[in-house]
């Protein structure tokens, strides 16, 4: 057993250790407080150990409390700003908690190593060279040559010069013109097929499924593919909805005159000539009106 001098020394040392007490109106209800005294010369060199109960005041300040009954007791509170409840009874619980946390960390590292995209925030080893590695999810796919011009809604046209190739995905001029040609054929074919279908329906509209089958069996839709710039002009007019209002006419390439075409003939793009300012009828009308106005003005003045 420890001597009485050793017990007294243990209490005095424990009191000296509490140098930062805080003022409070209640006693500290500690779950566990262990005060270990220094070893002495006796056989029992572990010192004096005591445990504080939950309902009794701290033994460290018991003497001070009974000496100063009329004053507010200065109770020590632990300097724990986090307010965590992670208290362990013995070292075995600490070791078990540490092993469990290390196991969870290893499992997360294994998952990140197998599939880096499976977690939102990978470890620092994977984000170290994130700026060098290309993005797999956020990088959009580049459109093929000609797709952007077709999807923009602007009039399509053939390209006579290759694009400035800034990356490997940019194709040459033939790829661009091929896509423009296919789009022009699609627009013209759709316009001609719609007109042929409307004509077949209006000639003998079906009233049941049997008549509809006969109409589809007997209907022949003839699609003519134009050549050169006429194809692009017809495709642009079909895209703008102007192809339906233009009358069916053919273009004689030898003479350049406009001739009336048959129903089965292809419809070419028409270029309307603007009226000349030297038109005799227009100038005659203007002169007659001006003369009439000038004559009326002179009559009123007289």
Curated annotation (Swiss-Prot):
Chain positions of motif Nuclear export signal: 212-224
Subcellular location: Virion tegument; Host cytoplasm; Host nucleus; Host Golgi apparatus
Amino acid composition bias (Polar residues), ranges on this chain: 157-170
Intrachain disulfide bonds: none
Post-translational note: Highly phosphorylated in the host cell. Packaging is selective for underphosphorylated forms.
Gene Ontology CC entries for this record: host cell Golgi apparatus; host cell nucleus; viral tegument
Record keywords, A-Z: Host cytoplasm, Host Golgi apparatus, Host nucleus, Phosphoprotein, Virion, Virion tegument
Bias (Basic and acidic residues): 1-10
Segments of this protein annotated with the region Disordered: 1-42, 125-170, 243-302
Phosphoprotein is among the record's keywords: yes
Region ranges (Interaction with gE): 154-244
Protein task: Tegument protein that plays different roles during the time course of infection. Participates in both the accumulation of viral mRNAs and viral protein translation at late time of infection. Modulates the RNase activity of the virion host shutoff protein ORF17 probably to ensure necessary levels of key cellular mRNAs and proteins. Plays a role in microtubule reorganization that occurs after viral infection by stabilizing microtubule network.
Family: Belongs to the alphaherpesvirinae VP22 tegument protein family.
Quaternary structure (record): Interacts with gE (via C-terminus); this interaction is necessary for the recruitment of VP22/ORF9 to the Golgi and its packaging into virions. Interacts with gM (via C-terminus). Interacts with VP16/ORF10; this interaction allows the formation of a tripartite complex composed of VP16/ORF10, VP22/ORF9 and VHS/ORF17. Interacts with the capsid-binding protein ORF44. Interacts with host CGAS.
Record-given protein name: Tegument protein VP22
């Amino acid at each position: 057993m420890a001597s009485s001098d050793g017990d007294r020394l243990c209490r005095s040392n424990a009191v000296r250790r509490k140098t930062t007490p805080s003022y409070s109106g209640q006693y500290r209800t500690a779950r566990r407080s262990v005060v270990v005294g220094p070893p002495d010369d006796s056989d029992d060199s572990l010192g004096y150990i005591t445990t504080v109960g939950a309902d009794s005041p701290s033994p460290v300040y018991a003497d001070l409390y009974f000496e100063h009954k009329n004053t507010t007791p200065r109770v020590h509170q632990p300097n724990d700003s986090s307010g965590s409840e992670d208290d362990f009874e013995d070292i075995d619980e600490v070791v078990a908690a540490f092993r469990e946390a290390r196991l969870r960390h290893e499992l997360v590292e294994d998952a990140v190593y197998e599939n880096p995209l499976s977690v939102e925030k990978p470890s620092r080893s994977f984000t170290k060279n994130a700026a060098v590695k290309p993005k797999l999810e956020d990088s959009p796919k580049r459109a093929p040559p000609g797709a952007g011009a077709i999807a923009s809604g602007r009039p399509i046209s053939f390209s006579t010069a290759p694009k400035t190739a800034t990356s490997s995905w940019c194709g040459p001029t033939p790829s661009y013109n091929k896509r423009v040609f296919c789009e022009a054929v699609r627009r013209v074919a759709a316009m001609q097929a719609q007109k042929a279908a409307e004509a077949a329906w209006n000639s003998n509209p079906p009233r049941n499924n049997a008549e509809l089958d006969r109409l589809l069996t007997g209907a022949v839709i003839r699609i003519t593919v134009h050549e050169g710039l006429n194809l692009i002009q017809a495709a642009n007019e079909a895209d703008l909805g102007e192809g339906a209002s233009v009358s069916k006419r053919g273009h004689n390439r030898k003479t350049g005159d406009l001739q009336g075409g048959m129903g089965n003939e292809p419809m070419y793009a028409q270029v309307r000539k603007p009226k000349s300012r030297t038109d005799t009828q227009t100038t005659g009308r203007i002169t007659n009106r001006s003369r009439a106005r000038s004559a009326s003005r002179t009559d009123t003045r007289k």
